[in-house]
Design a protein with these regions (language model features):
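Short cysteine-rich clusters marking metal-coordination/redox-active sites
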Residues: 3-6, 15-18
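Active-site-facing substrate-recognition patch
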Residues: 16-86, 94, 120-150, 187-191
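A phosphate-binding catalytic loop at a beta-strand-loop-alpha-helix junction
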Residues: 155-169
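PRPP-dependent phosphoribosyltransferase catalytic core
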Residues: 167-191
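A structural signal for isolated positions on well-ordered beta-strands in alpha/beta enzyme cores
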Residues: 86, 154, 181-184
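Short functional micro-motifs and their immediate structural scaffolds
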Residues: 8-11, 23
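Histidine/lysine/aspartate-rich catalytic loop segments that bind and position anionic ligands
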Residues: 106-127
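Glycine-rich phosphate-binding loops at beta-strand->alpha-helix junctions
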Residues: 89-101
Length: 191
């Protein structure tokens, strides 16, 4: 196999050098009173994040999320947040042979972060990719939660643009009295 970036021989779709060269740029936004952390600028990983639409994304996305997860676990440990936190990937339905959000969650969860799958599903399967804020507001996801409401959670999504999806998920989980400590987006498109 060859690295998709530099074309050198590699056991993974991104060689260690190219993965290390991708800069982490931690950003924090607050939505619904919850901190949302993003780790890459969309412009830096645009071609890689678009791999989510193809099967190769199942190999690329975990590499990106493992790198970000390693850094984030270090930050959590510095802040003394060592309790088990359970990750919820937003709408981790299988499309094109795998779930890109579940692949991200699996890669991100390290240390005290534990993945849970199939917990938060959208009843409205509309795609927000390239759509306006008005379209997003008029077509809510209408989430359903199938998890233990007594656990401590964090949310994960691939890209944060307007924050519409995360806001809706956070509002919905708040109505269920489900404790969400923070949310994570692999990259931020609000550059």
């Amino acid at each position: 196999m060859r690295c998709l970036t530099c074309l050198k021989l590699s056991f993974k779709p991104l060689c260690p050098n190219c993965l290390n060269d991708l800069p982490l740029s931690l950003k924090v936004r607050v939505l619904e009173g919850v901190s949302v952390y993003s780790f890459y600028a969309y412009s830096e990983i645009e071609e890689l994040i678009k791999s989510k639409y193809a099967l190769i994304g199942s190999r690329i996305l975990p590499l990106l999320s493992q790198k970000a997860g390693k850094e984030f676990v270090r930050i959590l440990q510095e802040k003394g947040l060592n309790i088990p936190l359970y990750g919820i990937a937003i709408d981790d339905k299988i499309k094109s042979f795998y779930s890109h959000s579940a692949a991200l969650l699996k890669g991100f969860c390290q240390g005290n972060l534990k993945p849970t799958y199939g917990r938060l599903r959208a009843n409205n399967a509309v795609s927000y990719a390239g759509k306006s804020l008005e379209f997003r507001a008029n077509n809510p996801r209408d989430f359903t939660f199938r998890g233990d409401e007594s656990l401590d959670y964090f949310l994960l999504d691939d890209i944060i643009t307007t924050g519409t999806t995360l806001k809706e998920a956070l509002k919905y989980l708040k109505t269920l009295n489900t404790k969400v400590h923070f949310a994570i987006a692999l990259c931020s498109a609000d550059e």
